[in-house]
Amino acid sequence: MTSFRLALIQLQISSIKSDNVTRACSFIREAATQGAKIVSLPECFNSPYGAKYFPEYAEKIPGESTQKLSEVAKECSIYLIGGSIPEEDAGKLYNTCAVFGPDGTLLAKYRKIHLFDIDVPGKITFQESKTLSPGDSFSTFDTPYCRVGLGICYDMRFAELAQIYAQRGCQLLVYPGAFNLTTGPAHWELLQRSRAVDNQVYVATASPARDDKASYVAWGHSTVVNPWGEVLAKAGTEEAIVYSDIDLKKLAEIRQQIPVFRQKRSDLYAVEMKKP
């Protein structure tokens, strides 16, 4: 298959976990009725985003929230990228994305590698590392359409992760993410377009909808970018579903027209994976 429909769910997050999960499943069903074959939820889709919330909302995987995702993926016969949730495992907390196949099987689990620790004086200070531990592995999964590579939010700033995924044959990179009102307007779209052009892949980001009353205000603007760096679809700040038809023939054409993979000077430099 050379094309398929991708859907990104820009969900309004509340403080009530069960409501978030129920509403996420409702939007997933709606996306499936519109022909979406791969659907992504946003970062921290079942929880407010913030260090103080992670311990309270954390679950095992499998657990309550991911069981619902497994069920709805099977019901709708889709590939479901479950945004992320705070995961508890062996006394540690992680920011984790679980992926489910059309039969409800857990296909992949990705723990955010690069924790969001920043300090922009007078604007925003945040330290995920106060409560979360970093993941230590890459994660891809295969579909009948293409291979998909996973990252979460801050991971998008690290070009090496995207390069390794491209080397491993990924044609679509999906980053559930929640940039903020400082970094969002400056870097959200720029980073997506950069990763797409650098690696000649499709890049998709799924953000929570903006809630100006939240302790952490998400930028929104869930986006799909093609390998030419063009924005194919983009949400505003409100709750929405973003749809984009992914054309893999277009990707192949771009790679043929500008064959950077064949032109890389591997005799001079390399980006390599040190741990599978």
From Swiss-Prot:
Question: What top-tier enzyme class does this entry carry?
Answer: hydrolase
Report the residues modified as N6-succinyllysine: 68, 123, 130
* Gene Ontology cellular component list: centrosome; cytosol; extracellular exosome; extracellular region; mitochondrion; specific granule lumen; tertiary granule lumen
Q: Which Gene3D superfamilies match?
A: Carbon-nitrogen hydrolase
The name of this protein is Omega-amidase NIT2
Every copy of the CN hydrolase domain together lies at 4-248
For this UniProt entry, which segments traverse the membrane? Answer: none
Active site location: 43 (proton acceptor), 112 (proton donor), 153 (nucleophile)
Which subcellular locations apply to this protein?
Answer: Cytoplasm
Give GO MF terms, alphabetically. Answer: 2-oxoglutaramate amidase activity; omega-amidase activity
The alphabetized UniProt keywords are: Acetylation, Cytoplasm, Hydrolase, Phosphoprotein
Query: N6-acetyllysine is carried by which residues?
Result: 68
Q: How does it assemble?
A: Homodimer.
